[in-house]
Amino acid sequence: AREYFVNTGTITSWIRAGKLTPEVQYKFGSKTLYLFSPDEVEKYRKQLGIKEHNDATIKEDFFAFLEERDYSLSYKMPFLLAFIRHVDSIGDAKIEEILEDYIAFYQDRITRGLPVDRSTCPYNETMLQDKKAMQRSMLTNPFEKFERKRFLYYSKDLSVISMNHALYSQMEAGDWKRVRRQMEEDLAEYYAKVEGAVVV
């Protein structure tokens, strides 16, 4: 899935539709692991007209991903703003610092009597006080969305979230400002819609 820049569900649907044929399949209870050789990956990439994603395209890919503005919930925006705020000179940010900002964003909304997010969001006063639950939630979504596309990585041993070195080395001051501006603008638009939908 990561080779093709799509999610696992897309790969599974392609296999069911006969567009891909894995060389090996391993069953683990209700789950199945599909394996492809590098040659097969390239063959299907050409057959399906899938663009190659590598270090040379990663910055373009990153901004294209942000431009999609795929926000089923607000998570990506406060998460990325927190990462940018704490990222150091080698592209690392301590997960604890990111998490503190992430929690603080939602706690501030509760304190001000504003909706935390859409009704499907589980964040409430109780959950926001449970740092372990919040870290699990943040690493599942939104972090995993960035990890799947190889923009960010998490080192449990070092307790840091790191930006892909190839991407970090291409990011200039103007790029960071561009990301920050988009996230702030997208947050404002997102919550204008959420608050507009709230019945007072």
Predicted regions and their residues:
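Intrinsically disordered, charged low-complexity linkers and terminal tails
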Residues: 1-200
